[in-house]
């Protein structure tokens, strides 16, 4: 089957459409600070997109590479399309932010400039400036003897045009660098926040004494943060990575954000020194550095402007005074975060670290929080003499420094730390505990779609699978041997791993459904669908009559609903208060027919990373996955549907139609089950009843 370029949606534009769906949450009937959250998330996402994706396209363009992607867009045409998209969307961001801040004022929560304050509050700002701001800000002159300074990625500064009152014709240009140690806003009272640049601007003549301020503008820079490491040539990978992190701080400037109405001479001064394209300059009529809005969102006096806090539940067979290993020994257990608590995952490692019967702990770490209880448990286990092997992925983007810290701490405690296989990132999420029971060794496993990170587990939807079945244990053992030793074989028997094996298995299962024609069914939930071979296979299956439902939160390069290609394919995206992160697959004619995976359907996951795909044999666990997919396919509140033109549309409801919010329903389901079973002391019986209640809800 020949696939026309028009049947592929551009990857970068599809990502921008996803971020637009994040921004679109501001149009919904949400508490005001929840809307402010989505603006902060949107801006943070966009920062990373520019640092990596736009930076990469620019490098290709500068290198003279004009190779087109599957959709026949060259690096230059993609850059033009991205800029056009974002310059248009800038106005949408401004409108949402302005409306939200106006509505917050009705709730007695204000963002005020220095000039808008009364005299008492101005004096308080003055005192704060001289006590806390003036000692740490950095005034910078730029002239023949003062070169243009180094500006850190995402740094926030004030650019100024000055003159000596005695010689007003002699213009001076300079900057005030605002260190990150200073909060973005000064909370001058419990309900009033003053942007720091407003206070600094008012005191410019104290910063540059004897000079008159002619004009000023707040600005923010973005640098290329993509980092290439020649692993094959590295004798000490940790040292090479540390050097790479230092070099990344000096990446080329790729975006300038500046206040709207800024003096043209100031813009020219910055852009000429940064060597930045004019179309990569974004002028905003609202505040800059909006990822820092979390400072306001976290105000404890305005929690009524947030969603009610949901407390994740611990369901049977887990519970107080229940051994993790005893529970897993009796049955496989599938948990869904954040509806179910992440605590059993932590307890799995903590109990292993203290259990005298445990002889070995192995696990992978990709993204962990700065104060990780899980890593501390591993350190404790290693310090106590247990055999601890940890695969720390040092190349996890923007977590490199944190992972370096933990790798060194683990090594110092006596753990065996490995950094994976040359040329591949290790993205699989797996932990293994080996326990001496009688005269035999028993292996317990945890396989997951999400990171070992208690912080992200509160806001990311993921699936955890605990099992002690031998067929899984054999494969997890092989997987860890591959990571820590030499192995030319990278194939597993029950689990599938990438590179290669997961993709082969997926293509085989798609082909199996295609062979069943109209009786074939595929349901796949993931973060991104980019791989051209998989997309082609899905088109071919659709042409054979297979019913295909795809739940793709982010990038989707497949174009659904096109006659002769994809009329049997539907694509939807779920965007809500939790970030959909789980990968769940269903193939009707495969046994077993449910899978969870750490891998998205992207070339990088299927060909350039070590990932795991886990078949789910356990009936109760499959029932849980089936209900999750059913709920998400019936969601008409958080869901957007992708049409054949590549546009995402909200689902239109008639007046009689009931609103189905899959995330809210899952909260209610899990809470109902928890409340029904919390007094049942027979944890095994309660676990089976929990599955039945979930399935029948």
Swiss-Prot record:
Q: Does the keyword Zinc apply?
A: no
Source taxonomy = Bacteria, Pseudomonadati, Campylobacterota, Epsilonproteobacteria, Campylobacterales
**Is ATP-binding given among the entry's keywords?**
yes
Gene Ontology cellular-component annotations: polyphosphate kinase complex
Pfam families registered for this protein in UniProt: PP_kinase, PP_kinase_C, PP_kinase_C_1, PP_kinase_N
**Family per UniProt?**
Belongs to the polyphosphate kinase 1 (PPK1) family.
Q: What is its EC number?
A: 2.7.4.1
Q: Which NCBIfam families match?
A: poly_P_kin, PRK05443.1-1, PRK05443.1-2, PRK05443.2-2, PRK05443.3-2
As for PTM, the annotation reads: An intermediate of this reaction is the autophosphorylated ppk in which a phosphate is covalently linked to a histidine residue through a N-P bond.
By its UniProt entry, which PANTHER family does this protein fall under? POLYPHOSPHATE KINASE (PTHR30218:SF0)
Q: Biological process GO annotation list? A: polyphosphate biosynthetic process
Its recorded name reads Polyphosphate kinase
Q: Which SUPFAM superfamilies match?
A: Phospholipase D/nuclease, PHP14-like, PPK N-terminal domain-like
